[in-house]
């Protein structure tokens, strides 16, 4: 199961690498793109931190043992479903890339 995730991640990184190689940017624009990338990263990290803090505050305010059990059960079911669909997606992607033999 871990090999599938590693393979899917490798394929995504490979596609992104080809996209980066294909986009030839003049030297002058690289500084502007770097600052834009930094701004986007900082913005996403700030959104993530605020969302995480809000979720933690909400969890602390509504902490009940029955609710905690329901959340844990929902998390385990959803991760099982997601891992199933990721496996299906990976298999489909590999068969698409490999082609019919």
Swiss-Prot record:
It is found in: Secreted. The keyword DNA repair does not apply. The keyword Transport applies. GO terms for cellular component: chylomicron; high-density lipoprotein particle; low-density lipoprotein particle; very-low-density lipoprotein particle. One of its GO terms (molecular function) is phospholipase activator activity. It holds the Pfam family Apo-CII. Keywords: Chylomicron, Glycoprotein, HDL, LDL, Lipid degradation, Lipid metabolism, Lipid transport, Secreted, Sialic acid, Signal, Transport, VLDL. Residues 1-22 form the signal peptide. Residues 66-74 are annotated as: Lipid binding. It comes from the Eukaryota. Residues 78-101 are annotated as: Lipoprotein lipase cofactor. Gene3D superfamilies: Apolipoprotein C-II (1.10.1440.10). GO terms for biological process: lipid catabolic process; lipid transport; positive regulation of phospholipid catabolic process. Proapolipoprotein C-II is synthesized as a sialic acid containing glycoprotein which is subsequently desialylated prior to its proteolytic processing. Belongs to the apolipoprotein C2 family. Component of chylomicrons, very low-density lipoproteins (VLDL), low-density lipoproteins (LDL), and high-density lipoproteins (HDL) in plasma. Plays an important role in lipoprotein metabolism as an activator of lipoprotein lipase. Both proapolipoprotein C-II and apolipoprotein C-II can activate lipoprotein lipase. PANTHER family: APOLIPOPROTEIN C-II. This is Apolipoprotein C-II. It comes from Tapirus terrestris. The lineage of its organism: Eukaryota, Metazoa, Chordata, Craniata, Vertebrata. The gene is APOC2.
């Amino acid at each position: 199961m871990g090999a599938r995730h590693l393979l899917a991640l490798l394929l995504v990184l490979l596609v992104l690498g080809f996209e980066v190689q294909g986009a030839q940017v003049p030297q002058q624009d690289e500084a502007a793109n770097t600052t834009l990338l930094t701004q986007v990263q900082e913005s996403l990290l700030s959104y993530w931190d605020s969302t995480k803090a809000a979720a933690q505050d909400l969890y602390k305010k509504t902490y009940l043992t029955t609710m905690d059990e329901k959340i844990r059960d929902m998390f385990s079911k959803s991760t099982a479903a997601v891992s199933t669909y990721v496996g299906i997606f990976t298999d489909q992607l590999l068969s698409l890339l490999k082609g019919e033999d």
